[in-house]
Every structure is written in structure tokens, then in C-alpha cells.
Amino acid sequence: MRDNTQHYRELFLDDIPLMDVRAPVEYHKGAFPNTVNRPLMNDIERQKVGTSYKQHGQQAAIALGHELVCGALKAERLAAWKAFAEANPNGYLYCFRGGLRSQIVQQWLKQDAGIDYPRVIGGYKALRNFLFETTRAAVDECDFVLVGGLTGCGKTEVIAALDNSLDLEGHANHRGSSFGRRATPQPAQIDFENRLAIDILKKRHRGVGQFVLEDEGRIVGSCSLPLELYQGMQGYPLVWLEDAFEQRVERILRDYVIDLRSEFERVVGVEEGFAAFSAYLQKSLAGIVKRLGGERYQRLAAILVQALEEQGRDGSVDTHRGWIEGLLKEYYDPMYAFQRQSKEDRVEFRGNQAEVIGYLRQRQALRPS
């Protein structure tokens, strides 16, 4: 039998498959990549056992757990654990603290299926703490630089072009603006933090000591950046990306209209997808009505409605440029100009996309760690 493990670093670096035997309610609050939920108890069973533990102690709770998970139900769950173990001979299982639940699953696998399967010592809590410390250590020990620029200038493309970048919006599955929602849901907060930490861990393992981030607010959709990282971002040097207004409009048209419509249609089907996409754009615009002001909002909303009608009818996207241009000129650009004033002393380079990518690569080569 392979030994139980405390080698948390290797689990994440090597993408080792993990079986989470916690209840679904625990799993959905946060877990790890390469993990599947094969619970010992469902949510109701867990609640009953927890109540018994509080009222009557550990032995009574264990006895109740064995009563609740027995017979055909036990056989069904055992079959799921057995299937995972056979499909993932290099994997591990874990519960919240690496205690009774994971030990019981180990015992049942051994007794009833003849399978020795190791667990993660310390369980979910130890893995989570390890990743938390991974992010904290990077903030303390590494060099960071931010990429800023006006809406639509292509900051995400710069992040994608660099091998030492951390894609905050990618990990959050959100573009970070009022219009940033994707067709698929955002991860849970803990999942977002875990994905980011694993990204940091893998890049540091490859020797990266200098990271490039997009200049973000604290909240990316519904995901909050780790506090230590966000606090550091208030002082990190800034590289400012520039692009022509017309190019920015075309990029937004591509990303937020053409590609996003296709994304919604892939997820929920053509007819429902276009309806969901249309509702998303209109809701996003309505979400900033107070900041736009009533008259401006009504004018841009009318252009958006007309644009969606034309797009739905014949696929034309030309009218979308009207509300995009209006939002940039009358809302986003003035807002960014105001915010940039407080960051001006941190700007160490300005340039177009090719120049910024070249500068950041040179910066990494000169100061790799």
C-alpha cells in the first residue's frame, strides 16, 4: 500500500487525482482542481450525525453514521469509491481534517473491496492552508508588475502572451467589468483562491520570480482577490497599454458581442443562447444606470435594443458600435482617466501591445527573480 501523504506541494504540482469524501454542501463551498466528490454521507446524513455528536458525543455519532450508511446505500457508495480508486491508482482521498470520515472510507475499501487507498493527512484544511501560504509567500518574496490601460485596449491579450503572468480574470471566469460576466458561472470564492495559488505554485516551481497581473479592483465579478495580493497591488509598478480608439471599439465588439453570443449559444443552444445573451447585455447596461444618468442611459439603451434586434434578425453587428463608442467616450474613458491620476507616479513604461509585451519580457529577463 502507498503511504498516506503530507506532500501537499507534489499533489498540486503533479495534478494528482483527489477524491473528496466530504458532504456535497462542503464540497461546493470550495475544493481543488482534479478533485471529484464521492461523499461518505450526504448533506442530510451529515447534519444528523453532527447533531448527534453535539448532543451525545463521538461514539453515538459514529454509531448513527453506520446506521445511516448501510446496506444498499453503503454498497452504492463503496462502488463509487472503488471505481475512482481503480481509475486513479496514483490518487488520494481526503475529508475535512483527514480524520474519521476518510479513515472509514479507507477501512471499507480495504475490508469490502480489497483496496488499500491512501488519504491526505490533515485533509482539506491542511491543503487549503498550504495554498493560502503559497499565495502569501509569493506576495512577500516575488516581484510583481501590473498592466493597466483603457477599456478594450487588450490587457487580457498581453496577459495571455506572457509565461509569467497570472490571469486573474481567467481564474475568476469574469472579465472584471460591469459587462464581464461569462456564459458559464463563476467559481466559488475558495475555488478561485485555490486556482490562483496553484498557478503561482506551478510557475514558481518553474523558476518564475516576477509576475505580471492585470490592474484590477478588489472584486472580479463575485470573486475577491486575496487581501495580501490586493494590498500589494496598490503599490506595484504599472505598465500602461495604449491602443487607438477605433481598435478598442472593434476589440470590445468582438469580445462582448460576437464571441460572447457564440459562447452563450454553445452553452444553452442557439435560440435560448441569443435570448440569454441579449438579456445579459441589457442587464449589464442597466446595472450602471445611476452612474450613467437617466438621459444617457435611455439613449444608449435604445441603441442597444436596436442593435440586438438587427443582430437577431440578420446577424449584423454594426449598430452595436454606437453604444460601445458612447460608453467608452462618456463613461469608461473619463473614469479611467480619473483613476489613472493617482497611479501616474507608478507608471514605468507606456506603449502599444507589441511594445508592452516586449518590455515585460525584457523586464523578466533582466530581473527573473
From Swiss-Prot:
This enzyme catalyses: 5-methylaminomethyl-2-thiouridine(34) in tRNA + selenophosphate + (2E)-geranyl diphosphate + H2O + H(+) = 5-methylaminomethyl-2-selenouridine(34) in tRNA + (2E)-thiogeraniol + phosphate + diphosphate; 5-methylaminomethyl-2-thiouridine(34) in tRNA + (2E)-geranyl diphosphate = 5-methylaminomethyl-S-(2E)-geranyl-thiouridine(34) in tRNA + diphosphate; 5-methylaminomethyl-S-(2E)-geranyl-thiouridine(34) in tRNA + selenophosphate + H(+) = 5-methylaminomethyl-2-(Se-phospho)selenouridine(34) in tRNA + (2E)-thiogeraniol; 5-methylaminomethyl-2-(Se-phospho)selenouridine(34) in tRNA + H2O = 5-methylaminomethyl-2-selenouridine(34) in tRNA + phosphate
Q: How does it assemble?
A: Monomer.
Q: What is this protein called?
A: tRNA 2-selenouridine synthase
Q: What is its EC number?
A: 2.9.1.3
Organism name: Pseudomonas aeruginosa (strain ATCC 15692 / DSM 22644 / CIP 104116 / JCM 14847 / LMG 12228 / 1C / PRS 101 / PAO1)
Q: Which PROSITE patterns match?
A: RHODANESE_3
**Record carries keyword Transferase:** yes
Regarding protein family, the annotation reads: Belongs to the SelU family.
Keywords per UniProt = Selenium, Transferase
Q: Which GO terms describe its biological process?
A: tRNA wobble uridine modification
**What domain of life is recorded for the organism?**
Bacteria
Q: Which gene encodes it?
A: selU
* Top-level class of the enzyme under EC nomenclature: transferase
Describe the task this protein carries out: Involved in the post-transcriptional modification of the uridine at the wobble position (U34) of tRNA(Lys), tRNA(Glu) and tRNA(Gln). Catalyzes the conversion of 2-thiouridine (S2U-RNA) to 2-selenouridine (Se2U-RNA). Acts in a two-step process involving geranylation of 2-thiouridine (S2U) to S-geranyl-2-thiouridine (geS2U) and subsequent selenation of the latter derivative to 2-selenouridine (Se2U) in the tRNA chain.
Domain Rhodanese: from-to ranges: 12-136
| Gene3D superfamilies hit by this protein | Rhodanese-like domain (3.40.250.10)
Q: From the Swiss-Prot or TrEMBL record, what is one GO molecular function term?
A: transferase activity, transferring alkyl or aryl (other than methyl) groups
Spell out the catalytic residues. Answer: C95
InterPro entries reported for this sequence: P-loop_NTPase, Rhodanese-like_dom, Rhodanese-like_dom_sf, SelU
